[in-house]
UniProtKB/Swiss-Prot annotation:
Family that this chain belongs to: Belongs to the coronaviruses ns2a protein family.
Keyword presence, Glycoprotein: no
Domain of life: Viruses
GO CC annotations on file: host cell cytoplasm
Record-given protein name: Non-structural protein 2a
Subcellular location field: Host cytoplasm
Main function: Not essential for virus replication in transformed murine cells.
A Pfam entry, by short name: Corona_NS2A
Keywords, in A-Z order: Host cytoplasm
Gene3D superfamilies listed in its UniProt record: Cyclic phosphodiesterase (3.90.1140.10)
Primary localisation category: host cell
Length: 261
């Protein structure tokens, strides 16, 4: 199994949009300044869900993986807990709990899509507050925040989102300049015309659908392509909507509710 031990990207969960968290986070950073500590403050608070070693032509697979994790985890909810400020190497970080299942699932989906994800060393979820030139004593600092976490889109807006970020990317207004981002609150929510994909499609349609899409969108093997499209169609996931938006033939068959071959 390949690991991203020399990563060039990471899956990012940005935090700057959570006002309750940010109020406490900025207060902690101001304490460092008041103490006269020479440090570099983190300008884009986030949690790195996993690291990747990928090429630009794999971005689409990463986007599909992120959409799949959001779609499949329709009931994914709980709390994200930030606490225990401490030094991790030369960085002051917060412990983070609540992303464990998300981490495991996104790594599994990315690997299934041919992406090198996660490292051979144990993943330690954390949120960086500041970086020092050398290790510092930080005893006495306190921090605690619990943020409700919802990764579901049932017509409700949510602040949750995932991004693909290239390591070393610049930061603007509290966010990384990402290669792509998927925000739950911006998702399309229309449903397939029937729960039975096979009722209106035949295997012979796959080539016509594939011809409307970009190379690599659908597997070249017809059975694999059929299985993938059927899976996402019946679950109203992002990939169904991607094909619906980009394939004239697919939209026609959906509208006619009958095979046009």
């Amino acid at each position: 199994m390949a690991f991203a031990d020399k990563p060039n990207h990471f899956i990012n969960f940005p935090l700057a949009q959570f006002s309750g968290f940010m109020g406490k986070y900025l207060k902690l950073q101001s304490q460092l300044v008041e103490m006269g500590l020479d440090c570099k403050l983190q300008k884009a608070p986030h949690v790195s869900i996993t690291l990747l070693d990928i090429k630009a032509d794999q971005y689409k697979q990463v986007e599909f993986a992120i959409q799949e994790i959001i779609d499949d985890l329709a009931a994914y909810e709980g709390d994200i807990v930030f606490d225990n400020p401490h030094m991790l190497g030369r960085c002051l970080v917060l412990d983070v709990r609540g992303f464990e299942e998300l981490h495991e699932d996104i790594v599994e989906i990315l690997r299934r899509r041919g992406c090198t994800a996660d490292q051979s060393r144990h993943w330690i979820p954390h949120c960086t507050v500041a970086q020092f030139d050398e290790e510092r004593e930080t005893k006495g600092m306190q921090f605690y925040h619990k943020e409700p976490f919802y990764l579901k889109h049932n017509n409700l807006l949510t602040d949750a989102g995932l991004e693909l970020v290239k390591i070393g990317s610049s930061k603007i207004d509290g966010f990384y300049c990402s290669e792509l981002s998927v925000w739950c609150g911006e998702r399309l929510c229309y449903k397939p015309p029937t729960p039975k994909f096979s009722d209106i499609f035949g295997y012979c349609c796959i080539d016509k659908i594939r011809g409307d899409l970009e190379i690599g969108d659908l597997p070249q093997d017809d059975e694999e392509a059929w299985a993938e499209l059927s899976y996402h169609y019946q679950r109203n996931t992002y990939f169904f909507r991607h094909v619906h938006d980009n394939s004239i033939y697919f939209r026609t068959v959906c509208r006619m509710k009958g095979c046009m071959c």
